[in-house]
Structures are given as structure tokens and as C-alpha cells.
């Protein structure tokens, strides 16, 4: 069974990778056709980051008690 630390590390790596893909203006951002535009990360990522006390790593997350 994987340790909590390794699972947390994998989740954070996945979040950073997914955020990089959807950040507007990044060179790797996929362009969508029609009326759709690239959106920022969903609240699920921020909720997870805040619960794990890593919200300070994501400037778009507004956690209560967030470190600077």
C-alpha cells in the first residue's frame, strides 16, 4: 500500500501538470474551436490543495489561512 507522502506527491505533480496545460497563454495550451476558451483550474484542485495545506503554492487558490 503506498504511503500518504507518495500519494500526496503524485497528486501535487498531477495538479501542477494539469494547471500548466490549461493556463492561458502558455505555449503548450491547446486551442479550442468555437465559443470555448481556455479556463483556469477548477475548484476541485484548489479544494485539494487547501486541504493538504499547499494552497500557498497556487496563486489562483484562495484558502483561508493561506501562507504568503
From Swiss-Prot:
GO cellular component, one term: extracellular region
Keyword annotations of the record: Acetylcholine receptor inhibiting toxin, Amidation, Disulfide bond, Ion channel impairing toxin, Neurotoxin, Postsynaptic neurotoxin, Potassium channel impairing toxin, Secreted, Signal, Toxin, Voltage-gated potassium channel impairing toxin
Main localization of the protein described in the UniProt heading: secreted
Cell compartments where the protein resides: Secreted
Disulfide bridge partners, by residue number: 46-61, 50-63
Tissue specificity note: Expressed by the venom duct.
Function field: Highly inhibits both nicotinic acetylcholine receptors (neuronal (alpha-3/beta-4) and muscular (alpha-1/beta-1/epsilon/delta) subtypes) and the voltage-gated potassium channel Kv1.6/KCNA6 subtype.
Record remark on domains: The cysteine framework is XIV (C-C-C-C).
The protein, known as: Alpha/kappa-conotoxin-like pl14.2
